[in-house]
């Protein structure tokens, strides 16, 4: 499903709410929502410190929630909105879940796997390719990360 700019911004604001939850828990503030037919079916935020699990990234949590909601591992006809460009692990999970579209706010120059450092989501050698859109609420998404790391360096 294609969404208007206003709808995309609204869903990204929901992802930013998830990032705020991560921030409150002293986690790297990344948030994610998965949308199907205009409804959020999965939410997630970074929870590695809280759960002491290296793989608990926002996208993984949102995919698990959406899988439970849909009672299926296939998330066809869904769009994943995430505040920061997915990493290699999350890009792999997105492909394995058969999510057809990812919208992310800000680039991840150090770990990005959706065009910045690597380009896993659109790699033609893989059996599932994902449409990628960037820049929705980019300043807000980048800002929460920049503030987090600026404050962390002061500690």
Residue locations for each model-derived region?
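Short beta->alpha transition motifs characteristic of CBS
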Residues: 41-48
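A cytosolic small-molecule/anion-sensing beta-strand core signal
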Residues: 36-37, 64, 76
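Short loop/turn microsegments at loop-to-beta-strand junctions
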Residues: 28-30, 78
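Small-residue (primarily alanine) positions within well-ordered alpha-helices
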Residues: 15, 19-22, 32, 42, ...
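A short, polar/charged loop-to-alpha-helix boundary motif
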Residues: 50-60
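Immediate flanking context of iron-sulfur cluster ligation sites
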Residues: 72-84
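Short beta-strand scaffold segments in enzyme catalytic cores
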Residues: 30-38
């Amino acid at each position: 499903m294609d969404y208007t700019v206003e709808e995309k911004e609204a869903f990204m604001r929901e992802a930013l709410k998830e990032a705020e939850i991560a921030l409150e828990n002293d986690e790297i503030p990344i948030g994610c929502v998965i949308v199907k037919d205009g409804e959020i079916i999965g939410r997630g935020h970074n929870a590695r410190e809280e759960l002491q699990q290296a793989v608990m990234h926002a996208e993984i949590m949102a995919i698990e929630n959406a899988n439970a909601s849909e009672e299926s591992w296939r998330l066809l006809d869904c769009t994943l909105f995430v505040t920061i460009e997915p990493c290699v692990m999350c890009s792999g999970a997105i492909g394995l879940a058969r999510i057809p579209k990812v919208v992310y706010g800000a680039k991840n120059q150090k770990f990005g796997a959706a065009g910045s450092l690597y380009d896993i989501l659109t790699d033609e050698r893989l059996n599932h390719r994902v449409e990628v859109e960037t820049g929705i609420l980019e300043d807000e998404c980048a800002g929460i990360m920049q503030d987090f790391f600026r404050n962390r360096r002061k500690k």
